[in-house]
Regions:
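Non-catalytic, C-terminal membrane-associated alpha-helical segments of glycosyltransferases
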Residues: 214-297
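Active-site-proximal specificity loops/subdomain of glycosyltransferases
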Residues: 60-98
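Short beta-strand-to-loop acidic/aromatic patch adjacent to the donor-nucleotide binding site
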Residues: 97-109
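Short, acidic, metal-binding catalytic loop of nucleotide-sugar glycosyltransferases
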Residues: 25-34
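Conserved nucleotide-sugar donor-binding
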Residues: 154-169
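A conserved acidic beta->alpha catalytic loop
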Residues: 41-50, 69, 108
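Conserved donor NDP-sugar-binding/catalytic core segment of glycosyltransferases
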Residues: 72, 109-144
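Short beta-strand/loop segment that forms part of the nucleotide-sugar
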Residues: 34-43, 65-67
Length: 297
């Protein structure tokens, strides 16, 4: 691995007292530690900032930004609370001092070699712009991988090269930020990828903060915001409907998309983004059918 990477980690956290100590210990124990780590507390009510401040005193690269009162409304995820807190952490540093920028949630525990192996993947592919290891969840004796496509990168644990981060304009403070950033990255010629061979542990089950059906509806709204086509959304809803509670998950996904369309929720205003996003989805649908794209040109 190139010894020169300087990784900045920013962790937006809220009410993570149950997990934060394990998360902090894991970052402190990295074989290749970050150059700096900023934990941004977004109005926790469970003692999270006190835990972070107490432990930070013994970790030279760790700082805590305690905002006191959360800025999120009734639905912080839908209002982009996480990227907003992330960006407030970024404002404390000179990005030019770093080579990589990573978002790490307060409930994700890294294995000791995580950053070292991730930096090796970046070093091996100059076009890799956004990456992560897999996430697993559940009790230690039966942990299971959270399934995602290889081109998708978990929002809880994303790492960007500084070049890519600047090329995509940073993180948008809105619902769907973690789809928008990847689409822009591929649009700009970068690769996005998750790696299965160095997983991290996600302590709070995916979607548990908001509920399964509400989360599926939010995913449907994300699809609208990112200009995903009605055909793709319909096919996706059929696939999603196979997850528990059966049928209702697909209906919730469609509901989120249709509701966003009726309410005319603001979409990504870039026409080039819209064209690329729909082109990319068409290619994936054709590949899933084992049909050559040339046959449909």
């Amino acid at each position: 691995m190139d010894p020169s990477p300087r990784v900045l980690i920013v962790s937006p956290v809220k009410n993570e007292a149950a997990h934060l100590q394990a998360v902090i210990r894991a970052v402190a124990a990295q074989d290749f530690p970050p150059a700096r780590w900023i934990v941004v507390d977004d109005g926790s009510s469970d003692g999270t900032p006190a835990i972070a401040r107490r432990v930070a005193a013994d970790i030279p690269f760790m700082d805590v930004l305690d905002e006191g009162v959360g800025r999120g409304g009734r639905d912080p995820l839908a209002e982009g609370a996480a990227p907003k807190a992330f960006n407030r952490g970024l404002a404390l540093v000179d990005l030019g001092e770093f080579t990589h920028v990573m978002k790490l949630d307060g409930d994700v525990e890294l294995p000791p070699d995580y950053l070292q192996r991730l930096m090796s993947e970046f070093a091996n592919d100059s076009r890799l712009g956004i990456a992560c290891g897999d996430l697993v969840e559940g009790p230690p004796e039966s942990r299971a991988r959270i399934p995602i496509p290889a081109h998708h990168v978990h929002g809880a644990i994303k790492c960007y090269t500084l070049e890519c981060f600047r090329a995509i304009g940073g993180l948008q403070e809105r619902l769907g930020w973690d789809t928008i950033d990847e689409t822009y990255a591929r649009m700009r010629g970068y690769k996005t990828r998750s790696f299965r061979d160095f997983p991290a542990v996600h302590h709070r089950r995916l979607g548990s903060a908001s509920g399964t059906l509400r989360g599926r509806a939010r995913h449907g709204e994300c699809a609208y915001v990112a200009h995903f086509s009605p055909l793709w959304v319909s096919l996706r809803a059929v696939k999603v409907a196979r997850a528990r509670p059966w049928g209702l998950t697909g209906a919730a996904f469609l509901y989120g998309y249709v509701r966003a369309a009726i309410q005319r929720v603001d979409r990504v205003p870039d026409p080039d983004f819209r064209r690329f996003a729909r082109w990319e989805l068409r290619q994936r649908m054709l590949r899933s059918l084992h049909v050559s794209p040339r046959a449909h040109l």
